[in-house]
Structures are given as structure tokens and as C-alpha cells.
């Protein structure tokens, strides 16, 4: 599957380090509650892809879901690609960075959260960086 930013796995391994590589390139996950962004709720700013720095989520779309991972109800337009994921005997939708293909987490719909999309983007903190400064996209 092609993405605008492509690198060899050796390049990704070197740039990301072991934990981010495991999560972002090997589709791993963090332990629930272990991520640095799980309990942070900034009012402004953006969350970007930890691998390629692509803007992904406005801080204003982050919400408390009590699931153990950072949760967002929507991504910036065109920034997160949805891929059907039937691994581990489950039907889920994987969220990946539309620029580099890095694994972010999964997207769940119809869980009854009172947000504008009724979606929960359950995202690994290791897949994100936070930028507090305002941008044209937030």
C-alpha cells in the first residue's frame, strides 16, 4: 500500500526507536493507561504523527472515553486513513497516518459517546506528538 512518504523499514527503525517502531510499523499497542496523552486535555493545539509530523487531530476533538488510550471524535480532513482490520478474530477499523502509513490505533463507531460523530479514535500516545502552538488548521 503506497503512501506519500515512504521509507525502508531500516530507516523507520533507526528514526523511531524500538517502542515507536513496534507500535507504528508493527501495529503494536501500549498498555491501557500507560500513554502520556491519555489524561491530557489541552484546549488548543494539534496532535501530529510521531513518525512524519503530519497534522492529525485538533486538541478540541480529544475527549475522555475511559478506555485507557487517548480518544478523539474526529481527525483533520484527509489526514487519517481507515483500513479494515480483521485480526485477532475481531472486526475493527485501523487508523493509520495518511502520509506515512504509521499505525495510530483503531476507530470505533456507534458506542454511544455524546460527541458530534459518535466515533472514538482510540490512538496510541506513542504514535502522537503534541504541538501547543496554533496553526492554520486548528
Swiss-Prot record:
Give the annotated active site: 122
In terms of one coarse class, where is the protein primarily found?
cytoplasm
Q: What is this protein called?
A: Uncharacterized protein C216.04c
State its location(s). Answer: Cytoplasm; Nucleus
Q: Which GO terms describe its molecular function?
A: metal ion binding; peptide-methionine (R)-S-oxide reductase activity
Pfam families assigned to the protein according to its UniProt record, in alphabetical order = SelR
Against SUPFAM superfamilies, the record matches this protein to:
Mss4-like
Q: Which family does it belong to?
A: Belongs to the MsrB Met sulfoxide reductase family.
User: Which GO BP terms sit in this record?
Assistant: cellular detoxification; cellular response to oxidative stress; protein repair
- Origin: domain of life: Eukaryota
Listed GO CC annotations: cytoplasm; cytosol; nucleus
Cofactor binding, per record? Binds 1 zinc ion per subunit.
The protein's required cofactor(s) are namely:
Zn(2+)
Concerning PANTHER family, the annotation shows: PEPTIDE METHIONINE SULFOXIDE REDUCTASE 2
Record-annotated MsrB domain positions:
9-133
Q: Binding positions for Zn(2+)?
A: 49, 52, 97, 100
Query: Is Mitochondrion there in the keyword field?
Result: no
Keyword annotations from UniProtKB, A to Z = Cytoplasm, Metal-binding, Nucleus, Oxidoreductase, Zinc
Q: Has the keyword Oxidoreductase been applied to this entry?
A: yes
Amino acid at each position: 500500500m503506497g503512501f506519500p512518504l515512504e521509507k525502508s523499514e531500516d530507516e523507520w527503525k533507526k528514526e523511531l526507536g524500538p517502542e515507536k517502531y513496534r507500535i507504528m510499523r508493527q501495529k503494536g499497542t501500549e498498555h491501557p493507561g500507560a500513554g502520556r496523552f491519555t489524561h491530557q486535555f489541552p484546549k488548543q493545539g494539534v496532535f501530529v504523527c510521531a513518525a512524519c509530523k503530519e497534522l492529525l487531530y485538533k486538541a478540541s476533538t480529544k475527549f475522555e472515553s475511559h478506555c485507557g488510550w487517548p480518544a478523539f471524535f474526529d481527525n483533520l480532513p484527509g489526514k487519517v486513513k481507515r483500513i479494515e482490520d480483521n485480526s485477532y478474530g475481531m472486526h475493527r477499523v485501523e487508523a493509520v497516518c495518511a502520509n506515512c502509513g504509521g499505525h495510530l490505533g483503531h476507530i470505533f463507531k456507534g458506542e454511544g459517546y455524546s460527541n458530534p460523530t459518535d466515533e472514538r479514535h482510540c490512538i496510541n500516545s506513542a504514535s502522537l506528538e503534541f504541538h501547543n502552538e496554533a496553526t492554520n488548521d486548528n
